[in-house]
Regions:
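Short glycine/threonine-rich beta-strand-turn micro-motifs
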Residues: 42-53, 124-134
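N-terminal, positively charged regions that mediate nucleic acid binding
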Residues: 1-27, 31-34
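An alpha-helical, amphipathic repeat domain used for nucleic-acid recognition
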Residues: 13, 40-43, 53, 159
Length: 161
């Protein structure tokens, strides 16, 4: 029986490349001179440090630009509020969301069931397996999921006949 998996996985090598590019831009930009702006990774968190709340927000925007250029969705990142630190520093905590949480998985299953397609969806630890009798039904299910505006970035893998 044909099937495929729906997952939400972050490519950490692309994130590292985007961090390097953003760090380079932050070190070269005039408005960040003397502001000690930097980006650090502590999986599953990313920290952005700078002197001043506005500089932290600007550094986050630079990082977002670099992520989008490398085709990494910003839906993986949840930014907190800039927190003041010692000596006028500020830091911003970015929480990385990988996998499909239970709420979004149920929304996808409901979306598939409401579409009246002859496919079944099963939730399995951060991913979904969708099975059907015909390959065409599975392709329609993929199109249906892509058309929905979900708050998570999805990939479709392991398409099997």
């Amino acid at each position: 029986m044909p099937s495929f998996d729906v997952v939400s996985k972050l490519d950490w090598s692309e994130v590292a490349n985007a961090m390097q590019q953003a760090q380079k831009e932050l070190s070269q930009r005039y408005d960040f001179r003397g502001k000690d702006a930097r980006i650090e990774e502590e999986k599953p968190l990313i920290w952005i440090f700078a002197k001043g709340e506005d500089r932290v927000s600007a550094a986050w925007q630079v990082f977002q630009e670099k992520l989008l250029r490398r085709k990494v969705s910003t839906l993986y990142f949840e930014a907190g509020e800039p927190e003041p630190g010692p000596k006028g520093d500020h830091k911003l905590k970015l929480t990385v969301k990988e996998g499909i949480d239970q709420e979004n998985a149920k929304a996808i299953v409901r979306l598939i069931k409401d579409s009246k397609l002859k496919v079944q969806a099963a939730i399995m630890a951060g991913e979904l397996r969708i099975t059907g009798k015909k390959r065409d039904d599975l392709q329609q299910a993929i199109a249906h999921i892509k058309a929905a505006a979900l708050p998570v970035d999805l990939q479709f893998i392991n398409f099997r006949d």
